[in-house]
Regions:
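Conserved catalytic or regulatory cores that recognize and/or transform ribose-phosphate-containing ligands
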Residues: 1-85, 89-190
Length: 190
């Protein structure tokens, strides 16, 4: 699959082993990275080339890579505006997006702002190095045939149809979305 993988460069040296582990695993599993930036960025940091005069070019490459991707994976242990913006772009483009962070994030509340995003395309996972590949595999496998849509006819009794009509009118949500959300809840439960 075509995957856009990114992470923050804010603490690059501290987390580069993890970033490269994710990148290398995706490549090893024969996925195509729509933007393979880690090696180049690591070299720039190592050489002390911190003057980013080409930031508009980098931004446009990131946007293009998100557009070309089938899936987006963002390592967000070090949250910042950049990763948050890329999460938003991916979700606006309706790209299935996995947001990862290692260990417990420093926060006062048990949920963060990102947990308030109501999107069927967003998955958030806390990982340890021992289960990182499993989390990534589960995410990729879930969306392996994501673009293969199947039409399905459903027979409802009048009571069920009335309920769907009522929810559609009162909550401004399509009947299809209501049914898909109920199915997703059941899938997640099982």
């Amino acid at each position: 699959m075509k995957i856009y993988f990114t992470a923050s460069t804010a603490e690059f040296n501290k987390y580069k082993k993890t970033y490269f582990a994710i990148r290398d695993y995706l490549v090893q599993e024969n996925h195509t990275l729509t933007r393979d930036w880690l090696k180049h960025t690591g070299e720039r940091i190592k050489e002390g080339d911190l003057n980013v005069s080409d930031i508009k070019k980098i931004y446009n490459k990131c946007v293009l890579a998100i557009n070309q991707a089938q899936l987006v994976i963002i390592e967000d242990t070090v949250s910042n505006f950049s990763t948050g913006h890329q999460i938003t772009l991916a979700l606006q483009k309706q790209k299935p997006t996995l947001v990862l962070w290692q260990g417990k994030k420093h926060r006062y509340f048990n949920q963060m702002f990102i947990h308030g995003i109501d999107s069927e395309h967003l998955e958030i996972a806390q990982y340890k190095p021992t289960n990182l590949e499993t989390i990534i595999n589960t995410f990729i496998n879930k969306y392996q045939d994501y673009n293969n849509k199947t039409r399905f006819n459903l027979v409802l009794n009048q009571y069920e149809r009335n309920y769907l009509d009522w929810v559609q009118f009162n909550r401004a949500t399509s009947r299809t979305k209501i049914i898909k959300n109920a199915l997703k809840e059941k899938i997640d439960e099982d």
